[in-house]
């Protein structure tokens, strides 16, 4: 196409515009239209992204305000609005908030369903999916919702997820609740000695160990 335009330019300078236009005119017009549509389409898409992002931001903030006022159910309904769910970043945020709000109103079934959806979503950031996987397991263990939860907790502990340390702490606490203090002490000791574990968690489990002495 570049050679075509160069040839047209040279021929025009030689006063052969009329003949060339009859030959190449339709291609020049077509190329110009493609360029205009491409640039205009990108600009339109870019502006739409900005507009959609602004709408999502307003709707998301409004949902948080409703939650802060105590209307958690209304906040969940607002987070389900289309203008939030169609914007990638806000879609993930709204799902996370919906799960947390469902927990606040004791709708554990809805919370678990949302945690699972987040964890299995192809387009969400890995860190968000790992958080959701942890919450999906932790809630089931804490609320004793199903018998498979403990096995899933052990599986999570065996991974390289950054949440494995909290999962291990939960396991130790459940051991205490079932009267198995020896197993709890072993787990807490492992966490306290693990240099990869978060410092605050290591301090916390050290306090648990003092209590269990």
Regions found by a protein language model. Name each.
Residues 1-34:
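N-terminal positive-inside, membrane-proximal cytosolic segments immediately preceding the first
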Residues 15-19, 23, 85, 158, ...:
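Membrane-helix interfacial "entry" motifs
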Residues 36-47, 71-83, 111-120, 147-155:
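Repeat-mediated protein-protein interaction surfaces in helical alpha-solenoids
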Residues 7, 14, 18, 40-57:
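Aromatic-capped interface at the extracytoplasmic side
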Residues 50-57, 73-76, 93, 147, ...:
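Amphipathic alpha-helical repeat elements characteristic of tetratricopeptide repeat
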Residues 2-10, 61-67, 91, 104, ...:
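Acidic, proline/glycine-rich low-complexity intrinsically disordered segments
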